[in-house]
Curated annotation (Swiss-Prot):
Na(+) binds at residues 157, 160, 163. It comes from Nitrosomonas europaea (strain ATCC 19718 / CIP 103999 / KCTC 2705 / NBRC 14298). This is ATP-dependent protease subunit HslV. The active site is at residue 2. Keywords: Allosteric enzyme, Cytoplasm, Hydrolase, Metal-binding, Protease, Sodium, Threonine protease. The lineage of its organism: Bacteria, Pseudomonadati, Pseudomonadota, Betaproteobacteria, Nitrosomonadales. It catalyses: ATP-dependent cleavage of peptide bonds with broad specificity. Its EC number is 3.4.25.2. SUPFAM superfamilies: N-terminal nucleophile aminohydrolases (Ntn hydrolases) (SSF56235). Allosterically activated by HslU binding.
Amino acid sequence: MTTIVSVRRGRQVALGGDGQVTLGAVVAKASARKVRRLYHNKVLAGFAGGTADAFTLFERFEAKLEKHQGHLMRSAVELAKDWRTDRILRRLEAMLVVADHEATLIITGAGDVIEPEQGIAAIGSGGAYAQAAARALLENTDLSPKEIVTKALTIAGDICIYTNQVHVIEQLD
């Protein structure tokens, strides 16, 4: 799996992920890019799960953003609806975290669109570790969202065997 974490402080949001791709018990790639900017660089998105499945979902989500003029919630709900009802999409195994200046959402293959509390979203095998670290840092420091994401990914990578220390982090100011 992987670790994807997003932290929001006001309208500033950062989203990051590690680069490890595993095939069974073997690390197949250490520097995969699981975080992207979408819709004219106004939306951040990261995935955990099957890489090919995630790319399909990125394409679908970007099409929804275009159709709905960048409206994050509506695009996420429409993607989740398609994901839940389409026979082919239903088989895709991935989760997404998406964020813009206004909201952060987790989108699942079960059709869930969740807006997490406290401005923190985390998915993947190291998600719980990253979420705990990010929450402690957000509540007890003045670090920027990008600094918190970096530290949370580092901590998750130290604990989770499916998460490495090669990070890609994007930020919207």
